[in-house]
Amino acid sequence: MQGIDVSKWQGTIDWKKVKASGVNFVIIRAGYGMNVDPRFYENYAGAKAAGLYVGAYWYSYALSRQAAEIEADCCKRTLAGKSFEMPIFYDIEEPNQLAKSAAFVSALITTFCTALEKAGYFAGLYMSRSPLQTKTTEDVRRRFAIWAAEYNTRLNYRGAVGMWQKSSSGKVYGINGNVDLDECFVDYPKIIKNGGFNGFSRGGNAAGGNSKNTPKQDAGTAPAATYYTVKKGDTLTAIAKRYKTTVSALVKANGIKDKNKIYEGQKIKIP
């Protein structure tokens, strides 16, 4: 599935032309630090009206867990009341972040993404291929959806990946100038709709801001939920062992009909 990612820097976009060009999805910058992207709401409305699958990303400047929590709160407020067929990604690429250890960077990612998961979002991580391999822990790479950037004819990343940003100089009908080009390898719209994430009620209907499954700005006293993203070769038995639970508990918590059938990219709730 072919897509693009955009921010205010693409200016005014003719989304009907973008859709007609063969683009299937778009990941829109919702904000950065504690700021909302000035064109986020405009881009969201236009992409939705054109029939594109829509996701979002939040560019991080966080240098502490507290700052990552604040960014997550800003992100949730910005996304509230909207539905997204694609994941919500945390964009980590600032040099002063990547100068830190893998444990430090992974703590930022886990803080932000867990906060989004508690609010009902399907969270993921955006990073360039090299720091993704050296500045994150295996637990982070296995737990969250991965969107890796590498401008090449192929992605030289050995781990499981859901999306690849393959160019920063693409040309797309309806957009003036360059735009990032992406390729998606996982059927996120199906997973997200069926799972009731990102503003959809379980089974695929948009919640419209009123369903109990709609992402909330404040998680209140609701218990924290942990999710695991299924990778190629995973089994429920292995996941159960990893999280010290049972296959039957996983089956019950996720409404799984056949314990022998799970698929790559699926979010498994850990009871």
Which role does the model predict for each range below?
Residues 67-70, 131-141:
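Glycine-rich, charge-decorated loop segments at or immediately adjacent to ligand/cofactor-binding or catalytic sites
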Residues 1-10, 16, 20, 139-217:
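Functionally critical loop-and-helix segments that line ligand-binding/catalytic clefts
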Residues 216-248, 266:
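Primarily a LysM-type cell-wall glycan-binding module
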Residues 1-122:
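Substrate-binding cleft of extracellular glycoside hydrolase catalytic domains
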Residues 119-134:
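Aromatic-lined carbohydrate-recognition surfaces of secreted/lumenal glycan-active proteins
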